[in-house]
A protein has these predicted regions:
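Membrane-embedded and juxtamembrane structural elements of multi-pass membrane proteins
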Residues: 1-195
Length: 195
């Protein structure tokens, strides 16, 4: 019981630290995204039947697009993405992030983290949790493709985003088989090789 309590306490502290970090991301180094992109976000939100207002912010603090919040969601877009990606790719990325909001993934992820915290000792929980995270991204990729109409645009958007994020580590991603490469292969219908 003491070991379980210690594990829960450590993971709860980790969860709280993560929450504080996310709140800091929302508040610091952000500015409203250009009006044209806010209008595109509003149009995509309407197509996804999202009734809540969504704030679209440009952030110098994030390297990848991020959704924060459930009741008052905020999409943080990296400044490099807004200035360095083509409009079709950027729209595909934005559609993916809005799909997370449509699916209430922020809340689902919090509940998932709670289960991980309480059942941290069980390997099946961590395996299943990893699978859920992969499938959550796949579902959002599929929704983005259904909105934007072209899996190749979404795949190129992911590749462009990774290039902007980590130009010097591009080969590392390909060599390690990171989840991004699996998502790109899945979108364009190229089978992934296991092992």
């Amino acid at each position: 019981l003491l070991v379980w309590l210690a594990g829960v306490a450590i993971l709860t502290l980790r969860l709280l630290a993560g929450w504080l970090f996310v709140q800091r991301l929302r508040a610091r180094g952000t500015a409203p995204a250009p009006l044209a992109w806010q209008q595109i976000a509003a149009r995509l939100s309407k197509r996804l039947h999202i009734a809540r207002p969504i704030r679209l912010l440009e952030s110098a603090m994030v390297e990848v697009p991020t959704v924060i919040g459930w009741l008052r969601p905020v999409v943080l877009m990296p400044a490099s993405a807004l200035s360095g990606m083509g409009p079709l790719q950027l729209e595909a990325i934005l559609a993916h992030e809005l799909a997370h909001i449509r699916r209430h993934d922020y809340l689902v992820n919090l509940l998932q983290t709670l289960v991980e915290t309480l059942l941290f000792y069980h390997p099946a929980v961590w395996w299943l949790s990893g699978r859920i995270r992969v499938e959550r991204e796949n579902c959002c990729d599929d929704l983005a493709v259904s909105l934007c109409g072209d899996p190749y645009t979404s795949a190129k958007a992911l590749a462009d985003l990774e290039e902007l994020r980590a130009d010097s580590n591009r080969l590392v991603l390909a060599a390690t088989g990171g989840s991004l490469i699996h998502r790109v292969r899945r979108l364009i219908g190229t089978p992934s090789h296991a092992g």
